[in-house]
Amino acid sequence: MASAQVVTFHADVAPIIFNECTSCHREGQIGPMPFTNYAEVAAYGEFIEYVTAIGYMPPWSPDAEYAHFVGEKVLTVEEVETLSAWVDGGKLEGNPEDNPGLPDFPDGSQIGTPDHVLAMPEPYVHGGDMTDQYQVFVLPTAFDGDVSIRALEVLPGNHAVAHHAILGLDVSGTAAQMDDADPDPGYEGFGGFGFNALSSFFGAWVPGALPVNYPPGIGRTIPAGADVLVQMHYGPSALEASDLTEVNVFLSDVPVEREVYTAIMGPQHLGAPFVLPPDEVTSFHGTMPVTEDVSLLNIAPHCHLIGSSWLVYATSPDNQDTIPLISVPEWDFNWQGYFTFPFLKKIPQGYTLHGEATYDNTASNPANPNDPPDWVGFGEGTTDEMFFVFIDLVLFEEGDESVALGPPGPCPADLTGDLVVGVSDVLLLLGDFGCLSACSIDLDGDDAVTVSDVLFLLGQYGTPCE
């Protein structure tokens, strides 16, 4: 940025804050303070400068230089420099006419009218004792037969304490029994659902994220009589807070020809027993063969409080080709997510999936639940650990690399699905530049990534996609 440029809130800072921060930092949401106008942002200007400079905010755990995902919240170097220059320049307000205005934050569904709404049977009251709580709620579906769905959408009843949610499926009735045995609504579940559910990762929600909305012909099946499980993470609160979360069910508009399956890499894929000695940093490397051509939709590495990093990728049989999937250099259990690729990502038959996780079981790990550090094994408790990589996939078909998984809208150049055409989209396009056939990105429809695609994107650069 040119040093002579005068940086103001309305012209330069508001577009950054409103697009990347305000979805959480507004009244009734999980952010501890609102960022909806000049006065609110200016009051925390120095704090914003610091947490963005060190990459602590916005909270996005995957390394955006390793792989891109739909809806990623990552500031560019230029945006961070703009925030810093604004603070250093005295936090000038500027001309209100330059302000782009707040984005539209819908109260209800973000993707349409649901076919069914599943609701918690009664409100859950989260205690005002400044602790995190993980509670599993059992939502009966009561479907007469199997149903094919294109989307599940979590609508938290209280955004001020709802931190994230993970969805599962149960057909055994076990979750309902655990619910009945707990005097509170639902039952406590820290690391998972407390038993071997039919699906332990059927979907997820984090603040500001759009639900996964499968392309036509792709979907999932909810079996007849199944219960949808919702593991809610409630963040610390100084006051009691009531929540009544709902799950919107969207049935497939066309017959589902390609069922989404979840591949799970777990401890059985490790070459060593899953044991974490005290006062040591331990790494594990899991591998899983790819026996058919597949296309990946989502990925979610999962461990607990001692976990410190993840790296997931695929390699060719001759180790000459590596497909990056996700890197989480600083794992934070409280900000785990369910990450959707911008386009279906092909992994050819014969490749090998790799999952590398590091665990810091030392006293220097502030998240370590044991003081002093102790031996830790596999389990669902707070003091236990896990090694899982959940990957949603379908069998590969020609043209999959061009099937977009981001939200539909007026901006085909919004490759990362973050609702604005910006630097991250340029970088994603340049990563495929020079492709001449079967390209994962093709904006002008000529089955290649050339200068015309770059010009197409630049023509939409800076466009908000709402």
How would you describe each model-predicted region?
Residues 13, 83, 152, 228, ...:
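Residue-level detector of buried hydrophobic side-chain packing
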Residues 2-139, 225-231, 460:
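Aromatic- and Gly/Pro-enriched helix-to-coil junctions and flexible linker segments
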Residues 35, 57, 202-205, 413-415, ...:
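Short clusters of hydrophobic/aromatic residues that line enzyme substrate/ligand-binding pockets
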Residues 5, 67, 407-466:
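Cellulosome-associated attachment modules in secreted, modular CAZymes
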Residues 62-69, 98-295, 300-408:
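Beta-strand-centric surfaces of beta-sandwich/beta-rich domains
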Residues 50-54, 305, 317, 432:
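Glycine-rich, acidic and aromatic/proline-enriched surface loops and short helix-turn segments
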Residues 30-33, 162, 307, 438-440:
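Short secondary-structure junction motifs
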Residues 27-30, 360, 434-435, 462-463:
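Acidic glycine-/aspartate-rich tracts in secreted/extracellular proteins
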